[in-house]
Amino acid sequence: MRFFALFIYRPVATILIAAAITLCGILGFRLLPVAPLPQVDFPVIMVSASLPGASPETMASSVATPLERSLGRIAGVNEMTSSSSLGSTRIILEFNFDRDINGAARDVQAAINAAQSLLPGGMPSRPTYRKANPSDAPIMILTLTSESWSQGKLYDFASTQLAQTIAQIDGVGDVDVGGSSLPAVRVGLNPQALFNQGVSLDEVREAIDSANVRRPQGAIEDSVHRWQIQTNDELKTAAEYQPLIIHYNNGAAVRLGDVASVTDSVQDVRNAGMTNAKPAILLMIRKLPEANIIQTVDGIRAKLPELRAMIPAAIDLQIAQDRSPTIRASLQEVEETLAISVALVILVVFLFLRSGRATLIPAVAVPVSLIGTFAAMYLCGFSLNNLSLMALTIATGFVVDDAIVVLENIARHLEAGMKPLQAALQGTREVGFTVISMSLSLVAVFLPLLLMGGLPGRLLREFAVTLSVAIGISLVVSLTLTPMMCGWMLKSSKPRTQPRKRGVGRLLVALQQGYGTSLKWVLNHTRLVGVVFLGTVALNIWLYIAIPKTFFPEQDTGVLMGGIQADQSISFQAMRGKLQDFMKIIRDDPAVNNVTGFTGGSRVNSGMMFITLKPRGERKETAQQVIDRLRVKLAKEPGARLFLMAVQDIRVGGRQANASYQYTLLSDSLAALREWEPKIRKALSALPQLADVNSDQQDNGAEMNLIYDRDTMSRLGIDVQAANSLLNNAFGQRQISTIYQPMNQYKVVMEVDPRYSQDISALEKMFVINSDGKAIPLSYFAQWRPANAPLSVNHQGLSAASTIAFNLPTGTSLSQATEAINRTMTQLGVPPTVRGSFSGTAQVFQQTMNSQLILIVAAIATVYIVLGILYESYVHPLTILSTLPSAGVGALLALELFNAPFSLIALIGIMLLIGIVKKNAIMMVDFALEAQRSGGLTPEQAIFQACLLRFRPIMMTTLAALFGALPLVLSGGDGSELRQPLGITIVGGLVMSQLLTLYTTPVVYLFFDRLRLRFSRKNSKPIVEI
């Protein structure tokens, strides 16, 4: 009591303390970063290696495997996957959450160095690594277009100057430049001209390499001067290479231009990028795993004026895609929802109390509690994101509850004629323990969340801590500022035998009288209520098992990502045509604002597209509805498929897949994997619970298999190395020399001119110069026949892997899809040599499913322990927790009614309900116990009186919590997919709980009281003195 008096009788000190909390909160709010969700990105590092011309199998065995063995020894690696394609290997390392990305990068570099001696010769550069997740959607895409500059020249400018500058911005992890490749001098050989001149391809290669050297020449000096020696030992342009003498035939010089076309071109002509209908160079910017997306985007935008100032006038630099506008719009929606919740809660208080002065007290307590929370959020390193702001929105109903309980009890004493300061002190003393019990038991609900590991634990930690801090500050404010304001602002009134009945007051009195009448009937029919209570418990179990489940609500971020998968034998020219066709279909959709895409590189039959939709206010359809509409149009394109998915703020795993969810097949036998993967994929494609089923296993690419006759080769004086070198020189886009320029290094690329390699007959024109100097056609010692070969070889760990990706049809939940996949795998009878498991988001969902019930039980157990300690009783906590089954039924029925699956957000709602609905029981039980102790009432009289006396605060607190959550249900616009499941769960649970617990709680209270008396009689024995 002295504690309360200290603040009630010292108003200046109390006001200043509240002002200090508010000022700290305002300062914290200004310093808090902004993000879509809490930081939950796994540390990911990507290792890249290249060997131009090498087959996928060669890359997997000679490059990927040595690197994987070395990288696999690094501590903290959670998952290692690799993909090897034509001339390229990419290894993705996903580390544990607690692994520092910079320390991991040092370990990766050390592992690369250790594996260097095991890698094949001829690699143009050492393997490199990047601290970015390639499966993440870019946070921003910039495009460069020009009417006068070539694509190669644009690419050079983008990669040499723009990408380097952008990469230095804080938060940027990777700048991937696509759409073309670096400039190069391309030597297109004419096989017939070479044969006529008796010049081998190796001879051409060696002549070019020898003519373009960069070596130090030294200096000459005398006693006075020093001269640096400089020679014209470098050739830099196609015009300089054309007159190069490569051979003498009967004393006549054979120049390079005689046997080849030499052009200024690009390193890899099999690359194409587009924005809308124009050829373009794309700069795809990804953030570091630990970086804040909004701060990073703001840093890039701040740099754009400087970038535009440095580019030539002939180049047009545009932002093709920016993730931040929808994130900002979503957060603005949450902030507006928070403001509406505060207003509705204050309105509820006013309608019940019918006093402007009384309403002003919680109207001050709520902002102080919420604003003060920002200071703690800043100190904890949190951000303003959808979850933390939703926590504050929900907290609105909680923080006002404490103030309402104190205010209502003080107002009751004032209505009885007590003086204001005395009423404030007496009223606060009576409900102080109740408020503390309510707050501590509510915070206890979130303790299991704080101890939860993995991605769900990281994701929910900010929500739990933010809400707990808001409740803690609210507790302090309600026991200090609220009673002080009541004592100094409210006035006592003369006791009335008949309360004034006006408006809401008349309705409340009528409700209270009706409740009293119905409660008497219920207390006389306790068995029927007991059956209802047990029915809600059983219904809870059935609903939880039956309701569809998912990991996280599908968001409409306004950004779509698409993966193109064409026939495995498609040419680059045909693939570029497919890209253009798909982009036209998408560009013509009324909901699309911008589309960019690229194809080429090591995987000729694949491409990527990034689609920006119009803002939510300018389109009627959701992102999923747009995808459904486009899927029908895109299916008409022959020879290729485009798989679309909405970009999400949470992306788990480092695999690049053409759909949102993945199921991975592993085997130590590549043959077994290749046998069973098509069967499994075909079976999964037939499931109605899955859509867009596709696989990264591509082993039907067209291959020309050359079979050497080694005996003939030996007789003709030809070795295998010379034959392989011939093929590499002719068809491998072989980089044979380096051109050094001040800003970059460029390559000289040699291959047979595409005019002479349009079909298989090009092999018949190839020849090798043997040891006697004779030209021997390839057909003399080799035979070839077409075959199928993999376009890529994938590993997970050190096992062969194939990932089947899939999306969900509209109306299907992830739990239904995973159950269907598991059932299909069992029915197929897949042998133990092929192992299947979910990966990425689907894997995290499976883990979350296994821990959900444990988490709910742990929360209930924690609340029970806290209540048991506070009440010094094993029984009373059970009475209080009896309110939970009805809330669970209401929440699950509401989700079913709105056709919303049970997600991680809905789980938060269930956890919140555990904390909310028990408040009603706490208020009843506290007053009943006090009435039994001090008033000498029977348990029946005590609980009946407690229910009637606490009816008004129970209605006020429940309606405050309900109206605090209602804006989440009704909210639309950006980010509503996250807010609505939380609001639906809470509103549904509160409505059902309010209808039932007003009757079940007193019945359960009496049941346990009678049980206690029965056991006490059995155990009572007379005390015998010895």
UniProtKB/Swiss-Prot annotation:
Tell whether Transport is among the UniProt keywords: yes
The record's family statement is: Belongs to the resistance-nodulation-cell division (RND) (TC 2.A.6) family. MdtC subfamily.
- Return the GO cellular component terms, semicolon-separated: plasma membrane
SUPFAM superfamilies to which the protein is assigned, alphabetical: Multidrug efflux transporter AcrB pore domain, PN1, PN2, PC1 and PC2 subdomains (SSF82693), Multidrug efflux transporter AcrB TolC docking domain, DN and DC subdomains (SSF82714), Multidrug efflux transporter AcrB transmembrane domain (SSF82866)
Q: Which InterPro entries match?
A: AcrB_DN_DC_subdom, Acrflvin-R, Multidrug-R_MdtC
Q: What is this protein called?
A: Multidrug resistance protein MdtC
Q: Give the way it sits in the membrane.
A: Multi-pass membrane protein
The species this protein belongs to is Salmonella agona (strain SL483)
PANTHER family, A to Z: MULTIDRUG RESISTANCE PROTEIN MDTC, PTHR32063
Record's keyword terms, sorted: Cell inner membrane, Cell membrane, Membrane, Transmembrane, Transmembrane helix, Transport
- Primary localisation category: membrane
Question: Its quaternary structure?
Answer: Part of a tripartite efflux system composed of MdtA, MdtB and MdtC. MdtC forms a heteromultimer with MdtB.
Superkingdom is: Bacteria
Question: In which compartments does the protein localize?
Answer: Cell inner membrane
Molecular function (GO) terms for this protein are: xenobiotic transmembrane transporter activity
Give me the segments passing through the membrane.
Answer: 15-35, 333-353, 360-380, 387-407, 431-451, 463-483, 528-548, 853-873, 897-917, 953-973, 984-1004
